[in-house]
Regions:
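Charged, glycine-rich active-site and insertion segments that engage polyanionic ligands
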Residues: 2-5, 12-122, 126-169
């Protein structure tokens, strides 16, 4: 059509061909700052409905959203759907092998893959706040990679938690 508009969205402009870029009107979008997301959260949401306890702070959720209010809502929803069995054990890295197997089973049975990846993000933030251990973050990043590649979720969680438990954290 002569009056048609084609909208092309990308997070990696440098990967597009110059011939494509030259024909586009570039509009750069930026994420909201943590303060802006916090303001949105306070102004538009009833925080009393959140199942947030000592393990997960509002600031952890804001950090996990990376400036996206919709991702913040998704993370809150996923956190609220988690059973207490899971949240109670994810306060810090698990050391007991039996608990690792139990939690891995619960996570893989109760959550879809995208929810599991979101949970990994939240775990990273909680554990980073408590331990400041880079190894933990790298190991959990590998877990996200395994989950995205559709490697058996339960096995992925078990291997990751067991690796972490063998480290002196």
């Amino acid at each position: 059509p002569s009056n048609g508009i084609f909208i092309l969205l990308t997070s990696k402009l440098n990967l597009l061909l110059n011939t494509i870029i030259s024909r586009c009107q570039i509009i750069r979008f930026r994420s909201f700052s943590g303060k802006q997301v916090n303001s949105i959260l306070k102004d538009y949401l009833d925080t009393s409905k959140f199942n947030i306890n000592k393990k997960l702070k509002i600031q952890d959720l804001i950090n996990s959203a990376n400036g996206s209010p919709s991702l913040l809502l998704k993370n809150i929803e996923i956190w609220n759907e988690l059973s207490d069995e899971i949240t109670n054990k994810l306060d810090s890295p698990i050391k007991n092998s039996l608990e690792i197997l139990e939690v891995s089973k619960l996570i893989s049975e109760q959550l879809e893959i995208d929810q599991q990846i979101c949970l990994v993000n939240l775990i990273q933030i909680i554990w980073w706040r408590k331990t400041k251990n880079v190894y933990l973050l790298k190991t959990l990043e590998k877990l996200k990679s395994y989950l995205r590649k559709n490697i058996q979720p339960r096995l992925s969680w078990e291997i990751t938690f067991l690796k972490i438990s063998m480290e002196n954290i």
